[in-house]
Amino acid sequence: QNSIIGQGLQNHSAGGLIQTEISNGVTLYRNLYIDNKTRNPKVKGLNQYINNVIYNWGNGAAYNMGGESEGESETTIENNYFIVGPGYNYIGVEQANGTVETIFESVTPTKPFTGGNSSFRTYWVGNYYDSNKDGVLNGHLMNWDTDCSGNPTFL
């Protein structure tokens, strides 16, 4: 809790992989996930994801609901704020002389919630999404049908 999880290495820019047993979970509370391309975090098992801020996740997943993998998950996802940032990836381009030049490629971010199947059960409430990049914190209460993807079971 109360941590900054950011700037994952660019060839594997991930915020975290959290897997627990359904009988013994983890709480992710009041964290700032910033500049990670994906897995902010990717979760399976029993977890609470409450009062976090997720900024600039690029074209990976802001919150990955266990992907399409098997296994039971029960989650509480409550009062988080997802803010779209400039969104870019580093790309190494090999030059004619054999050196590698790093360039930036602009990307379109994914929807904040991705993955998830009927084995991923969630209580989901009070999450906000600010997608307009205007520099003002003025997001809207998230709507699953328009702001998210995946097919979890809602509790």
Each predicted region: which residue ranges?
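Right-handed parallel beta-helix
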Residues: 1-39, 46-59, 73-86, 123-130
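Extracellular beta-strand/beta-solenoid scaffold signature
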Residues: 7-21, 35-39, 58-68, 91-113
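Generic marker of residues within folded, mature protein domains
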Residues: 31, 67-70, 117
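Long, contiguous C-terminal flanking segments immediately downstream of a protein's structured core
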Residues: 78, 82-155
